[in-house]
């Protein structure tokens, strides 16, 4: 139990996909202007990551490995992720039109988010069990959400601040991201697995 706690904590704070592995930067920079947008893209991405990790674990161990089709892994993963995103979009459109309107613009973008493909692949390459794969996906998604919300709240304050002309736009965004990354590097000595 203790090792699972450290495993989850490590994936959220120390091995954060945005700040350490530099995955998922497109929605991080593009959809973090407001906290509402950050929560929307984070929720949708987290849901797709967890569901696709579960599906892809089963596909890998019950179809690709037994039939020696490992060379098709990335193509199959991309197809399943695309199918999952479309399925979620159809379900949301029919069951919750309000949630669909909030997340509607973000759902197609999730398919191209590299973190959605990377999390199941890293889980596979790290030889995680089924439970560890689920915990890895949930904790990585929570880390993604945490950083998105922190950054979007800081970014909202930056928009209200008087930023020098040379730093307006992308420069201040990149400086802020680098400072947040340095803060998260401080957690490096917190957990040793």
Swiss-Prot record:
Q: What keywords were assigned to this record? A: Cell inner membrane, Cell membrane, Electron transport, Membrane, Translocase, Transmembrane, Transmembrane helix, Transport
Keyword field contains NAD? no
Mind telling me which Pfam families this protein's record contains? Rnf-Nqr
Q: Where does the source fall among the domains of life? A: Bacteria
- State the membrane topology: Multi-pass membrane protein
Disulphide bridges, residue numbers = none
EC class (word): translocase
Membrane spanning segments where? 5-25, 47-67, 72-92, 102-122, 134-154, 171-191
Name its cellular compartments. Answer: Cell inner membrane
The record's GO CC annotations read: plasma membrane
Main localization is membrane
Catalytic activity, EC: 7.-.-.-
Q: Name one GO biological process term.
A: electron transport chain
Subunit structure of this chain's protein: The complex is composed of six subunits: RnfA, RnfB, RnfC, RnfD, RnfE and RnfG.
PANTHER family of this UniProt entry?
INTEGRAL MEMBRANE PROTEIN OF SOXR-REDUCING COMPLEX (PTHR30335), ION-TRANSLOCATING OXIDOREDUCTASE COMPLEX SUBUNIT A (PTHR30335:SF0)
Q: State the similarity comment.
A: Belongs to the NqrDE/RnfAE family.
The free-text function statement in the UniProt record for this protein reads: Part of a membrane-bound complex that couples electron transfer with translocation of ions across the membrane.
In Swiss-Prot or TrEMBL terms, this protein is called Ion-translocating oxidoreductase complex subunit A
* Species of provenance: Buchnera aphidicola subsp. Schizaphis graminum (strain Sg)
Q: What is the lineage of its organism?
A: Bacteria, Pseudomonadati, Pseudomonadota, Gammaproteobacteria, Enterobacterales
